[in-house]
Amino acid sequence: MASHKWLLQMIVFLKTITIAYCLHLQDDTPLFFGAKPLSDVSLIITEPCVSSVYEAWDYAAPPVSNLSEALSGIVVKTKCPVPEVILWFKDKQMAYWTNPYVTLKGLTQSVGEEHKSGDIRDALLDALSGVWVDSTPSSTNIPENGCVWGADRLFQRVCQ
């Protein structure tokens, strides 16, 4: 039963990503940062953080019409200065790095949309709500050249 709830939450989450991507067409906030061909999902963890090789990445959205059918998994890398959220497509052997702020906000909203309570939902809501309580409004735009994300002010841009 718990696995069914998780599946339903992921479907809602993927719909939220799709909606956010459609909104991207009208907004300057990109959802997808870059794409890279990788033969195995385990290679995602060994990749350097996007922020350290930013210029080398191609901007691309997954070439699929229905993310929920083609998506094989979601990886969250927390070892980077800014956590990274990566969508993995096994059939295409491609990984797509997403805007972590937009993606995590979509995850928070999708978990919150389910009206039935359950152990998994409650645990996720508790964990995710703590993240957003103390956060200040921040730009989800990609930093311009010469800008870095300050470690002490993770959610603010620092430009020289």
Curated annotation (Swiss-Prot):
The record's GO CC annotations read: host cell Golgi apparatus; host cell plasma membrane; membrane; viral envelope; virion membrane
| Annotated localization | Virion membrane; Host cell membrane; Host Golgi apparatus, Host trans-Golgi network
Q: Which domain of life is it from?
A: Viruses
List the signal peptide residues: 1-22
Q: Where is the gL alphaherpesvirus-type domain?
A: 28-160
Q: Which residues cross the membrane?
A: none
InterPro entries, from UniProt? Herpes_gL_N (IPR007923), Herpes_gL_N_sf (IPR038311), HSV_GL_alphagamma (IPR034708)
- Which cysteines in this chain are paired by disulphide bridges? 49-80, 147-159
PROSITE patterns noted in UniProt: GL_AHV
Q: How does it sit in the membrane?
A: Peripheral membrane protein
Keywords on this record?
Disulfide bond, Fusion of virus membrane with host cell membrane, Fusion of virus membrane with host membrane, Glycoprotein, Host cell membrane, Host Golgi apparatus, Host membrane, Membrane, Signal, Viral envelope protein, Viral penetration into host cytoplasm, Virion, Virus entry into host cell
Provide the family line.
Belongs to the herpesviridae glycoprotein L (gL) family. Alphaherpesvirinae gL subfamily.
Q: How does it assemble?
A: Interacts with glycoprotein H (gH); this interaction is necessary for the correct processing and cell surface expression of gH. The heterodimer gH/gL seems to interact with gB trimers during fusion.
Q: Give the protein's biological function.
A: The heterodimer glycoprotein H-glycoprotein L is required for the fusion of viral and plasma membranes leading to virus entry into the host cell. Acts as a functional inhibitor of gH and maintains gH in an inhibited form. Upon binding to host integrins, gL dissociates from gH leading to activation of the viral fusion glycoproteins gB and gH.
The protein in question is named Envelope glycoprotein L
Species of provenance = Varicella-zoster virus (strain Oka vaccine)
Q: Lineage of this protein's species?
A: Viruses, Duplodnaviria, Heunggongvirae, Peploviricota, Herviviricetes
